[in-house]
Amino acid sequence: MNVQVINKSKHPLPAYATELSAGMDIRANLSEPITLAPLQRCLVPTGIYIALPQGFEAQVRPRSGLAIKKGITVLNSPGTIDADYRGEVCIILVNLSSEPFVIEDGERIAQMVIARHEQAVWQEVEVLDETERGAGGFGHTGRG
């Protein structure tokens, strides 16, 4: 699939790290480093603008290494970029650790997954069909 992209950063386009990767690493595009204090959040620019085909979205997800090693994650995970959005792709990061974290220019801060989606059409009914699970949720099926 081809996706139109404008790269206003000085960094490479988002790229797959391996042949079978689902997500492309996306980089911070900063004029100076950002220091994220514990529990602080910020909007990080990437310098990337995309035009997705109709029926697709881009999901912005955390990078597992940053999450486990540094406590840095995408706050609205997954963030959704709609096919009709034409602004700069920016990433909302939060520092969940107890230590400050410095985001450097060019650092891989998140991953982007391109996915198909459908738009639902609501069908109002009076009663939903029965299932084995029923209304059970929030830990209903076992521990955790």
From Swiss-Prot:
Keywords noted in UniProt: Hydrolase, Magnesium, Metal-binding, Nucleotide metabolism
Catalytic activity: dUTP + H2O = dUMP + diphosphate + H(+)
Pathway(s) served: Pyrimidine metabolism; dUMP biosynthesis; dUMP from dCTP (dUTP route): step 2/2
Gene Ontology BP terms: dUMP biosynthetic process; dUTP catabolic process
Protein known as: Deoxyuridine 5'-triphosphate nucleotidohydrolase
Positions of substrate binding: 63-65, 76, 80-82
HAMAP family: dUTPase_bact
Annotated Pfam families: dUTPase
EC number(s) per entry: 3.6.1.23
UniProt similarity note: Belongs to the dUTPase family.
Keyword Ligase: no
UniProt function note: This enzyme is involved in nucleotide metabolism: it produces dUMP, the immediate precursor of thymidine nucleotides and it decreases the intracellular concentration of dUTP so that uracil cannot be incorporated into DNA.
GO molecular-function term, one example from the UniProt record: dUTP diphosphatase activity
Cofactor: Mg(2+)
